[in-house]
Amino acid sequence: MAENPVCTAQVNIGSGSQSNSCISILGSNSINSNSVPVLFCFSVFARPSSVPHGSGYELLIQKFLSLYGDQIDMHRKFVVQLFAEEWGQYIDLPKGFIISERCKIRLVPLQIQLTTLGNLTPASTVFFCCDMQERFRPAIKYFGDIISVGQRLLQGARILGIPVIATEQYPKGLGSTVQELDLTGVKLVLPKTKFSMVLPEVEAALAETPGVRSVVLFGVETHVCIQQTALDLIGRGVEVHIVADATSSRSMMDRMFALERLARNGIIITTSEAILLQLVADKDHPKFKEIQNLIKASAPESGLLSKV
């Protein structure tokens, strides 16, 4: 959750009188008869304002947005809490609560759930292929191997009907996606300058793809574009699976520490074969034979996995 707001005001939400500190912070001269003074708290900030008598949850959210709109990521989930004088702490806003007297409330981002089962289904999954470009070939460790595994993943996506989104980092200077990767039928191929793949076009594509809850992510570089993409996605409530045998960096140290950090943040570090077999789940799956043929040739033993 966000840090507890630093507020000096103490308020009484019962029928008694308000404390002097709250009155001095909120002021009383500018409040008309139909307005109720409220101290709105978000993160470490507290801002006094007023709302119409009888305001409920939706109006409170709108007020939070008007006060802190540039700081609130509305892709996150939030809970509105009310300071309860009786308990001396914040409590979740009771169902049906309306503003009837001076009070103090806060907006709290919910913590990302760090424990996830990591189940995958073709209908709820999208593959992200990140910046597998020609100019990176000489610099990225085991680049030829991650291309080979990346192609296996793209073939698997086509077999299972899974959408693929690919990006190219500044293609004018860094070239196009390598020829070994067949991008036939991918949903999007987008140029970018931002390190994260979570561009407006990508967000729109995810929004128009019903039921998506998981992204399988691979490409380069692990500690830059892969890491920033993964963090942006989990911040939006999307489960992320990073394919360890299909992602690399120029430095193995950068790669190792990025994967460790991402795993601590609830991102699943996995392999290409595990992904593909999880997606079919059963030998009686109509596409199992095609996936089996795809994985019969083992993924390259490049040394990447010993560095996870």
Swiss-Prot record:
Please identify the protein, giving its name as recorded.
Answer: Isochorismatase domain-containing protein 1
InterPro entries noted in UniProt: Isochorismatase-like_dom (IPR000868), Isochorismatase-like_sf (IPR036380), Isochorismatase_domain (IPR050993)
Entry's Gene3D superfamilies? Answer: Isochorismatase-like
Give one Pfam family, short name only: Isochorismatase
Instruction: Tell me what organism the protein belongs to.
Output: Xenopus tropicalis (Western clawed frog)
Q: Quote the PANTHER family the UniProt record gives.
A: HYDROLASE, ISOCHORISMATASE DOMAIN-CONTAINING PROTEIN 1
Q: Which family does it belong to?
A: Belongs to the isochorismatase family.
Gene that encodes it: isoc1
What is the superkingdom listed in this entry's lineage? Eukaryota
